[in-house]
C-alpha cells in the first residue's frame, strides 16, 4: 500500500527513466528542421564528423542526440519512414545497457538501427542478434540501404559460411546473425591454431532481438562443440527392451507410504526415480540378459555406466512424448522447442537421453558425443562490453535480467493507445468441453469475418484442432513444426478477413500480423510491379483492413495456459498492434497439464462448490488468480534451475577464461621460448624434489629412481651417481642446477640441428595440441563430476562447495600434467625439419575435420542438489578490460596470487 502511494507521488522508476530520456528526444526533434536542409552528401559526411569527434575524446553520449537525428533523417530519405518519438526512447534505452520492452508492431527493427548506428561509428563492431537465420538475413537486408547510405558496412553471420565469409561478416561495422552462430564462432575461435583462423573481434556491443527468448528460454541450453565418442548403440537397444516391463506408481516411497511399483514420476520436477523394488527388478533383468554379474549391484562403482543407460531409457519412456517433445522424421529423432514449437534439426539431448529416445522409437541410434568445448549463453553474452535487448514481453522476467545480467528493464510506451480487449479465462472440467467451446468461438468469428489466431502448446494439440476444424468444415491454416516451411507467409496472412490460423506457441514470432493481410508480400510476388499495380494493391488492402477492423480486429484464442505468463502475453501481443482493435481469450480445462500439476485442488474445489454441469464454464477473478499463482510457481522453479546451472557453469567459466586467455597469448606470441624455459625449470625441479627431498640426508635420496625417470620421460641419460661419487661438493641445489644445465644443453643441440625458427614453431604446436587434448579430457571429467555431485548432499556436504573444490583440484592436475607432457614431448621427439611441423599441423587439421557440431540441451537432472536447502545467489561476472596482474588474486577462486596459480603458464 505504502509502495503504491509513493509511486503515485514520485512516479515509478520506469516513469523517471522515460522522463530523463524525454529531454534528449526534445533535443533530437529540435535538430530535425536543420537536418532536413542538408544534402545527401552533407548528411553522409556526419558519420566522418562523428568519428573524428570520438577520436578527439568525445563520448557516445555527447553525440547521441545528433547521431539519432541523422538516422531519423536518413530513414525518411531511404525508407520513407520517420521513427516515432517512442522509437527514439527505445533506441536510447538500448544504448544504455538496458532492455527495452516494446509491444508487437511498435517497430523494434527500425528502433534497433538507432543504437546500432551510434555504436557502429566506433568501428569496434555491433552484433545484432536474432533467433533464426531467416530473421537475421531479413533484418540485415532490410536495413542495409540505410546503413550503407550513412557509410557503415553490414555483415550477415548465418550457418554454412566459410571462414573467409565469416571474417568479412565480423569485420563489418554492424553484423546481423543468430545467437547460436555467435556462440559457436567464439568456441571455434578458441580452438584455432593460428591467429589467422580466428574470425571474431573482441566482443564490444550486442543488441539482442527477442531477448527473453535468448537470455531466458535458451539459458538452460549450453552450446557444445563435440566429437563422436565410443559406440554404445547396442547397449541402448538392449536396455530399451527392459523398460516396458517396469510398473509405475503414483508417488515416491516414504516412511508413511510404500507403493508396489518400480518407479515414480515427479511431473513438477520432470524427474523419474527407481524404487527399491524397481532397482532389484532391473538388476534381475540385467543378470538374466548377461549384462550384470550375479550378486553385483547396479549402484557399484564399476556399473555407473550401466546405471546411466538405465536412467536415460527410463526418462525417454516416461518423460518424453512423441509429437510433443520430439518428432520422428526420416528415421531421425528431432527435438521440438518447448518455447516456440519449432523443430531444431541438429540439436541433441545430452547424457545419452537422445540415444535412449532413438532406441525407444526404433530410429537409428547415433553415437554419443564427447564435449570438446562448451559455454552457456549466460556466460557468453556477459563477456560483451555493452549488452542490450528488446522484446514485447520482458517485464515479468525483469528480476532475472537484473539478477543474472545486470540489465534493467524499461517499458517503452506505445505510439498509439492499446485498445485490445483481453477477456477473462474460461475454465471447463474436461478437455472435450473446452474444445467444443473453442470451435463454437471460431465459428462465431468466421460469421463476423473476424480473423482468428489459435495458439497451442504442442504439435499434438494443433493436430487435434486441425481435425476438429476439418470436421466442422472450417477452412484454416496450420503452422507447427511439421509445416514450418511457409511460416512467414502463413503468419503474414493471418490477419486476412475471416482467416483461421493454428500456431504452436510463438511460431512466426518476428513477423507482424497485419489486419487485412500483408500487402508487401503481394507486391513482392509480382515481377517488376508498376506504380499502378502497387497503388491498386494498397487501395484493395485498405478496404480489407477497414473491414477487419469493423469485425473486431484479430482475435487471439489460447487453448491452454503456458507455464510462463510471458509466453501467454506474447500470444496476446499478436493482436492490437499500432492501436488496432483486437481481442484475446484463453480456454482451459482441469485436464490441462498446468492445471493438473499446479492448480487442480483449489480450482476443482471451487468448481464443485459452484455445482457446475457438463459444458458449463467458470469465469471468475479467483480462478484467474489461482492460475497466475501456479504460473508464478513454475517461473520461480525454472529461474532456480537456470540460476543453479549458472552457478555450476561459473566455476567452469573461470577455468575456461584462464585457459582461453593463455591459449590466445600462446597463439599471438612470436615465440614461447621463455614460457618453455620456465616450465622446464618447474618440471625438472619438481621431479628432483620427489627423489631428492629438500634438506634431507643423502641416505634418503633415490638416485637410481631419478636417473630412470629422467631417462624414460625426458630422454636425459645422466649418470648422477657417478657425479656424486666424483664430486664431494655436490649437494641438492648444485645437483638440480647441473641436471637443468644438462637438459638445456640437450635442447640447445636439438635447436642447432633443426634451426631456431622450426623449433619455435614446433614448441607452439606441441603446447597448443597438448593443452587442447588435456582440456577436452578435463571437460569430460567435469561432466562426470557434475552428474554425481548431488549425491554429496546425502553425506551432509554442500554439493556446490564440493564441486568448486574438486573442480579446482582437477584444474590443478590439468596444469601439472600439461607442463610434464609438453617438456616430455619436446625432450624426446626428434624434429628433422619444417616438414615435421607441417605434418603435425596437417594431422591436427584432419582430426578437426572429423569434429561435428552438436547444439545440446543441458540435463537439469544432474544439477539438482540433494540435501541443499538454500540456493546461493550467483556472482555476476563483469568483463574486465585489463589483463590480470601477476600479484592479483587468481580468478579461479583458490585464494592464491595469479602468478602462483594459473599464471604459472604465462
UniProtKB/Swiss-Prot annotation:
The record's free-text note on cofactor binding: May bind 1 zinc ion per subunit.
Residues that coordinate or bind Zn(2+): 890, 892, 901-902
PROSITE patterns: SECA, SECA_MOTOR_DEAD
Broad EC category: translocase
GO biological process, any: intracellular protein transmembrane transport
Record GO terms (molecular function): ATP binding; metal ion binding; protein-exporting ATPase activity
Entry EC number(s): 7.4.2.8
Primary localization: membrane
Topology with respect to the bilayer: Peripheral membrane protein
SMART domains membership: SecA_DEAD, SecA_PP_bind
Subcellular location: Cell inner membrane; Cytoplasm
Superkingdom assignment: Bacteria
UniProt entry tagged with the keyword Aminoacyl-tRNA synthetase: no
Coiled-coil residue spans: none
InterPro entries linked: Helicase_ATP-bd, Helicase_C-like, P-loop_NTPase, SEC_C_motif, SecA, SecA_CS, SecA_DEAD, SecA_motor_DEAD
Residues covered by region (Disordered): 879-906
Catalytic activity: ATP + H2O + cellular proteinSide 1 = ADP + phosphate + cellular proteinSide 2
Record's keyword terms, sorted: ATP-binding, Cell inner membrane, Cell membrane, Cytoplasm, Membrane, Metal-binding, Nucleotide-binding, Protein transport, Translocase, Translocation, Transport, Zinc
Cofactor(s) required for function per UniProt: Zn(2+)
Cellular component, GO annotation: cell envelope Sec protein transport complex; cytosol; plasma membrane
Gene3D superfamilies: Helical scaffold and wing domains of SecA (1.10.3060.10), P-loop containing nucleotide triphosphate hydrolases (3.40.50.300), SecA, preprotein cross-linking domain (3.90.1440.10)
Binding annotation for ATP: 87, 105-109, 512
Subunit structure: Monomer and homodimer. Part of the essential Sec protein translocation apparatus which comprises SecA, SecYEG and auxiliary proteins SecDF-YajC and YidC.
General function of this protein: Part of the Sec protein translocase complex. Interacts with the SecYEG preprotein conducting channel. Has a central role in coupling the hydrolysis of ATP to the transfer of proteins into and across the cell membrane, serving both as a receptor for the preprotein-SecB complex and as an ATP-driven molecular motor driving the stepwise translocation of polypeptide chains across the membrane.
Listed NCBIfam families: PRK12904.1, secA
Name of the protein described by the UniProt record: Protein translocase subunit SecA
Classification of source organism: Bacteria, Pseudomonadati, Pseudomonadota, Gammaproteobacteria, Alteromonadales
Amino acid at each position: 500500500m505504502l509502495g503504491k502511494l509513493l509511486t503515485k507521488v514520485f512516479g515509478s522508476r520506469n516513469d523517471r527513466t522515460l522522463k530523463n530520456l524525454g529531454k534528449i528526444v526534445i533535443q533530437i526533434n529540435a535538430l530535425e528542421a536543420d537536418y532536413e536542409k542538408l544534402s545527401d552528401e552533407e548528411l553522409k559526411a556526419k558519420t566522418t564528423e562523428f568519428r573524428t569527434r570520438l577520436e578527439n575524446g568525445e563520448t557516445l553520449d555527447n553525440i547521441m542526440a545528433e547521431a539519432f537525428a541523422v538516422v531519423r533523417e536518413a530513414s525518411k530519405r531511404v525508407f520513407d519512414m520517420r521513427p516515432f518519438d517512442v522509437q527514439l526512447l527505445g533506441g536510447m534505452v538500448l544504448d544504455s545497457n538496458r532492455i527495452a520492452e516494446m509491444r508487437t508492431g511498435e517497430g523494434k527493427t527500425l528502433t534497433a538501427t538507432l543504437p546500432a548506428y551510434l555504436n557502429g561509428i566506433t568501428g569496434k563492431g555491433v552484433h545484432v542478434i536474432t533467433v533464426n537465420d531467416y530473421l537475421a538475413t531479413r533484418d540485415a537486408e532490410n536495413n542495409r540501404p540505410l546503413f550503407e547510405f550513412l557509410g557503415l558496412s553490414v555483415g550477415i553471420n548465418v550457418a554454412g559460411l566459410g571462414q573467409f565469409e565469416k571474417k568479412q561478416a565480423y569485420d563489418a561495422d554492424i553484423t546481423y546473425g543468430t545467437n547460436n552462430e555467435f556462440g559457436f564462432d567464439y568456441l571455434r575461435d578458441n580452438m584455432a591454431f593460428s591467429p589467422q583462423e580466428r574470425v571474431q573481434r573482441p566482443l564490444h556491443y550486442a543488441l539482442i532481438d527477442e531477448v527473453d527468448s535468448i537470455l531466458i528460454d535458451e539459458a538452460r541450453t549450453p552450446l557444445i562443440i563435440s566429437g563422436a565418442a565410443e559406440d554404445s548403440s547396442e547397449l541402448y537397444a538392449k536396455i530399451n527392451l527392459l523398460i516396458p516391463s517396469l510398473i509405475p506408481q503414483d508417488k515416491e516411497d516414504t516412511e508413511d507410504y510404500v507403493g508396489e511399483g518400480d518407479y515414480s514420476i515427479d511431473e513438477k520436477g520432470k524427474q523419474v526415480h527407481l524404487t527399491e523394488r524397481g532397482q532389484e527388478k532391473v538388476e534381475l533383468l540385467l543378470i538374466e540378459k548377461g549384462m550384470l554379474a550375479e550378486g553385483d549391484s547396479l549402484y557399484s562403482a564399476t556399473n555407473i555406466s550401466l546405471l546411466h543407460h538405465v536412467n536415460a531409457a527410463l526418462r525417454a519412456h516416461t518423460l518424453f512424448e512423441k509429437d510433443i517433445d520430439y518428432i520422428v522424421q526420416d528415421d531421425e529423432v528431432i527435438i521440438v522447442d518447448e518455447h516456440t514449437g519449432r523443430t531444431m534439426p541438429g540439436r541433441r539431448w545430452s547424457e545419452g537421453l537422445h540415444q535412449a529416445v532413438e532406441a525407444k522409437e526404433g530410429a537409428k541410434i547415433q553415437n554419443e558425443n564427447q564435449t570438446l568445448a562448451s559455454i552457456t549463453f549466460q556466460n557468453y553474452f556477459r563477456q560483451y562490453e555493452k549488452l542490450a535487448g528488446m522484446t514485447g514481453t520482458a517485464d515479468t522476467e525483469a528480476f532475472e535480467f537484473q539478477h543474472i545480467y545486470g540489465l534493467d528493464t524499461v517499458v517503452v510506451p506505445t505510439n498509439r493507445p492499446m485498445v485490445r480487449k483481453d477477456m477473462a479465462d474460461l475454465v471447463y472440467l474436461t478437455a472435450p468441453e473446452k474444445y467444443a467451446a473453442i470451435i463454437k468461438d471460431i465459428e462465431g468469428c468466421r460469421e463476423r469475418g473476424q480473423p482468428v489466431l489459435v495458439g497451442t502448446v504442442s504439435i499434438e494439440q494443433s493436430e487435434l484442432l486441425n481435425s476438429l476444424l476439418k470436421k466442422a468444415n472450417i477452412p484454416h491454416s496450420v503452422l507447427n513444426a511439421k509445416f514450418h516451411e511457409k511460416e512467414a507467409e502463413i503468419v503474414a496472412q493471418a490477419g486476412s478477413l475471416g482467416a483461421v490460423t493454428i500456431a504452436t506457441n510463438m511460431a512466426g514470432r518476428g513477423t507482424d500480423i497485419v489486419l487485412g493481410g500483408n500487402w508487401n508480400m503481394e507486391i513482392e510476388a509480382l515481377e517488376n510491379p508498376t506504380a499502378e499495380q502497387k497503388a491498386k494493391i494498397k487501395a484493395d488492402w485498405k478496404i480489407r483492413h477497414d473491414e477487419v477492423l469493423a469485425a473486431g480486429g484479430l482475435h487471439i484464442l489460447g487453448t491452454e495456459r503456458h507455464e510462463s505468463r510471458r509466453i501467454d502475453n506474447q500470444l496476446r501481443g499478436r493482436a492490437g498492434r499500432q492501436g488496432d482493435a483486437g481481442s484475446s481469450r484463453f480456454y482451459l480445462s482441469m485436464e490441462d497439464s498446468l492445471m493438473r500439476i499446479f492448480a487442480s485442488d483449489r480450482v476443482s474445489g471451487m468448481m464443485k462448490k459452484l455445482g457446475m454441469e457438463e459444458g458449463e464454464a467458470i469465469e471468475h477473478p479467483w480462478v484467474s488468480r489461482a492460475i497466475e499463482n501456479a504460473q508464478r510457481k513454475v517461473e520461480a522453479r525454472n529461474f532456480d534451475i537456470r540460476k543453479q546451472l549458472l552457478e555450476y557453469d561459473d566455476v567452469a567459466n573461470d577455468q575456461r577464461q584462464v585457459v582461453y586467455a593463455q591459449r590466445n597469448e600462446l597463439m599471438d606470441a612470436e615465440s614461447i621460448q621463455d614460457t618453455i624455459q620456465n616450465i622446464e625449470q618447474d618440471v625438472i625441479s619438481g621431479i628432483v624434489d620427489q627423489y631428492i627431498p629438500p634438506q634431507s640426508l643423502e641416505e634418503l635420496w633415490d638416485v637410481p629412481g631419478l636417473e630412470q625417470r629422467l631417462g624414460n620421460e625426458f630422454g636425459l641419460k645422466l649418470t648422477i651417481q657417478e657425479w656424486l661419487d666424483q664430486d664431494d661438493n655436490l649437494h641438492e641445489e648444485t645437483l638440480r642446477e647441473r641436471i637443468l644445465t644438462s637438459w638445456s644443453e640437450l635442447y640447445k643441440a636439438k635447436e642447432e640441428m633443426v634451426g631456431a625458427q622450426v623449433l619455435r614453431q614446433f614448441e607452439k604446436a606441441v603446447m597448443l595440441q597438448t593443452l587442447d587434448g588435456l582440456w577436452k579430457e578435463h571437460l569430460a571429467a567435469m561432466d562426470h563430476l557434475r552428474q554425481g555431485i548431488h549425491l554429496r548432499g546425502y553425506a551432509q556436504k554442500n554439493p556446490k562447495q564440493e564441486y568448486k573444490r574438486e573442480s579446482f583440484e582437477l584444474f590443478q592436475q590439468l596444469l601439472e600434467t600439461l607442463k610434464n607432457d609438453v617438456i616430455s614431448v619436446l625432450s624426446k621427439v626428434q624434429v628433422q625439419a619444417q616438414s615435421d611441423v607441417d605434418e603435425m599441423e596437417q594431422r591436427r587439421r584432419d582430426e578437426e575435420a572429423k569434429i561435428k557440431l552438436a547444439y545440446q540441451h543441458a540435463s537439469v537432472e544432474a544439477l539438482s542438489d540433494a540435501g541443499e536447502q538454500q540456493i546461493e545467489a550467483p556472482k555476476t561476472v563483469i568483463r574486465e578490460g585489463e589483463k590480470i596482474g601477476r600479484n592479483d588474486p587468481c580468478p579461479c577462486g583458490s585464494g592464491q596470487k595469479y602468478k602462483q596459480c594459473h599464471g604459472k603458464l604465462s
